[in-house]
Amino acid sequence: MKKLMKFQSSLFILISSFALLFGYGLDLNANFQLLLLALIFLVLLGVPHGSLDVLFAIQTFDLKHLKHWLKFIGSYVIAALLVISIWLIATNIFFVCFLLLSALHFSDDLNLIDFKALKLSYGALIITLPSLLFSHELIDLYAMIIDIKTSTYLVEASKFITVPGGLYLTLMLINKKIGIRTKLETFSVCALFLLLHPILAFSIYFCGMHSARHLIRSHFFLRKFTKRAFLNALIFPTIAVIILGIFTWLMAENKTLEVEMIRIIFIGLAALTVPHAWVLQKSNFQAWLITRKFKDDY
């Protein structure tokens, strides 16, 4: 596991460096092809890490009989539909709660057992950092989901969170107990969200760090399954999500490709994040990481 984590870490840092070098100043709003490419990568490389929930469920809930499968699938689908229902009924409140849950979920990238505040700062800055230099772009993105007034308020509030959060993170990274690789990863993530267009930064982060790291850890946590079962769990649910997304877009009244794609991807990620987090919590995945003592995973 340590070798794979080192490789993933080094690759992410390298990709981030190239992205910062060649992607700084790129306006995705004026480059639809690049925007489309970023969204495609987000779906193809980001969504699969949630597809492993099936294997987590088999290992956790001992799904040997049809009734157990139906109970799990029913609970998972109901949770996803409940998220969508809340979004339709109380969009603004739901969006704020989703951002908070996302920050908490992203904080698990860093397996720093003794630095919970640092982890939370890391997760929060992933959400808030773009507000410093890309406030207009972030407002436009949020306005695709919620009203423009709330979007503006959220972005302005994010600025106030970013400054103290960034200072705390900087001070904590001076700590000698934190490995140099973790410091480089954190710096790379923060640089992406500070200097690149929010969609480009999130696509690189979500695919290269969050999803990739989860896949590697999951591979070792789910050791009872064969490689074929692992690949099947990655491929088939991902295909189903893509088909559902295409169907949703075809049924949409407003077929503005850019807006609808971003909206569908967001709602899809939101709907799947809640049951995904629930499955991970039930599986004691984080507890396993702690007991294995992968402090920095390498």
What does each of the following model-derived ranges do?
Residues 16-21, 74-84, 100-106, 166-168, ...:
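Hydrophobic, membrane-inserted alpha-helices
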Residues 21-33, 252-256:
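Short, hydrophobic transmembrane alpha-helix segments
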Residues 27-33, 85-94, 193-202:
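Transmembrane helix interruption/hinge and helix-loop junction motifs
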Residues 35-44, 91-104, 201-213, 265-269:
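Hydrophobic core segments of alpha-helical transmembrane domains in multi-pass membrane proteins
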Residues 59-74, 78-132, 139-149:
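Membrane-interface helix-loop-helix junctions at boundaries between adjacent transmembrane segments
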Residues 118-138, 155-172, 185-201, 239-240, ...:
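Alpha-helical transmembrane segments of multi-pass integral membrane proteins
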